[in-house]
């Protein structure tokens, strides 16, 4: 049987490339920066422009499909995931990087049907790296097949995480205490490039062994999640249970052994789900 979603994926790859052009062009100009949920949660006119471009283009071609977009949700739309084919879009993952010219900025497009990830695209605009993953077909970066590492020993692992955009002292305390606990196991190190999507792609590429974070949103992980699993990795909840796209937390790991060990070590931050009011 023909793959019903391949055409959607091909179209999304083209759109992600076009969105990357807009992002690169915008970096040459003065930008208008706005603040969302905290002084460190930033949005620019380019985020809004790219999301509008992506959703408008996809809606024209696939009018019956649903959408969850970071900037649409910020403007008051709900992020409710149904069984309908749904595009989950982060127009610029790494807005703070974008604002500062720090060179890790991604366009992320995830496509979910019956609440299951079908394909994901993460385009690293300044590196010109197009990461793609399609259910059952593998994960690639610029056409090269991706494969996770085989590192199961946490003491020999390189992890990726972020400090997040919350500036609430208690949340910051938990984030830093989790990092301290992991570093002192010890492990080889902790890195972070400032975007959830690219951190996950680094796990898919075998450059890092696992990524964990709490406080992310569905649009941060919907594109990269399937890239990780198609590269041979696993997605788990930070409790060690099954991954839930709307839960705002994830461990993306090269293997389950490492993911479960991370889950055992970290303290959980209480968060409101993406699909709660």
Curated annotation (Swiss-Prot):
The pathway is: Polyol metabolism; myo-inositol biosynthesis; myo-inositol from D-glucose 6-phosphate: step 2/2
GO molecular function terms attached to this record: fructose-1-phosphatase activity; glucose-1-phosphatase activity; glucose-6-phosphatase activity; glycerol-2-phosphatase activity; inositol monophosphate 1-phosphatase activity; inositol monophosphate 3-phosphatase activity; inositol monophosphate 4-phosphatase activity; inositol monophosphate phosphatase activity
User: Record's PROSITE patterns?
Assistant: IMP_1, IMP_2
Q: Give the matching Pfam families.
A: Inositol_P
Q: What is its main location?
A: cytoplasm
Q: Which residues bind Mg(2+) 1?
A: 70, 90, 92
From which residue to which does the signal peptide run? none
Domain of life the protein comes from: Eukaryota
Residue positions of the PTM Phosphothreonine? 168
Q: Which reaction does it catalyse?
A: a myo-inositol phosphate + H2O = myo-inositol + phosphate; 1D-myo-inositol 1-phosphate + H2O = myo-inositol + phosphate; 1D-myo-inositol 2-phosphate + H2O = myo-inositol + phosphate; 1D-myo-inositol 3-phosphate + H2O = myo-inositol + phosphate
> Where does this one sit in the cell?
Cytoplasm
Record keywords: Cytoplasm, Hydrolase, Lithium, Magnesium, Metal-binding, Phosphoprotein
Q: Which cofactor does it need?
A: Mg(2+)
Q: What InterPro entries does UniProt report for this protein, alphabetically? A: IMPase, Inositol_monoP_metal-BS, Inositol_monoPase_Li-sen, Inositol_monophosphatase-like, Inositol_monophosphatase_CS
Positions annotated to bind substrate: 70, 92-95, 194-196, 213, 220
User: Residues that bind Mg(2+) 2, according to the entry?
Assistant: 90, 93, 220
Q: Which family does it belong to?
A: Belongs to the inositol monophosphatase superfamily.
Q: What is this protein called?
A: Inositol monophosphatase 1
Supply the source organism for this entry. Answer: Bos taurus
């Amino acid at each position: 049987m023909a793959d019903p979603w391949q055409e959607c994926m091909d179209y999304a790859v083209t759109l992600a490339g076009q969105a990357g052009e807009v992002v690169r062009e915008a970096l040459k100009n003065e930008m208008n920066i706005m603040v969302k949920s905290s002084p460190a949660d930033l949005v620019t006119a380019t985020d809004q422009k790219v999301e509008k471009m992506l959703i408008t283009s996809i809606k024209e071609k696939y009018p019956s499909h649903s959408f969850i977009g970071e900037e649409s949700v910020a403007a008051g739309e709900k992020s409710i995931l149904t069984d309908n084919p749904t595009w989950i879009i982060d127009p610029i993952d790494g807005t703070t990087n974008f604002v500062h010219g720090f060179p890790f900025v991604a366009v992320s497009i995830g496509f979910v049907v019956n609440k299951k990830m079908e394909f994901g695209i993460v385009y690293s605009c300044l590196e010109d790296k197009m990461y793609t993953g399609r259910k059952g077909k593998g994960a690639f970066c610029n056409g090269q097949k991706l494969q996770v590492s085989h590192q199961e020993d946490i003491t020999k692992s390189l992890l990726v995480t972020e400090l997040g955009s919350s500036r609430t002292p208690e949340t910051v305390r938990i984030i830093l205490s989790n990092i301290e606990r992991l570093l002192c196991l010890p492990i080889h190190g902790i890195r972070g490039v400032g975007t959830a999507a690219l951190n996950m792609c680094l796990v898919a590429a075998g450059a890092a062994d696992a990524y964990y974070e709490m406080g992310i949103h569905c649009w941060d992980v919907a594109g990269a999640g399937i890239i990780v699993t198609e590269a041979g990795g696993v997605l788990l909840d930070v409790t060690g249970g099954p991954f839930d796209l709307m839960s705002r937390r994830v461990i993306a790991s090269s293997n389950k052994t490492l993911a479960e060990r991370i889950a055992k070590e970290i303290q959980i931050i209480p968060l409101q789900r993406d699909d709660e009011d």
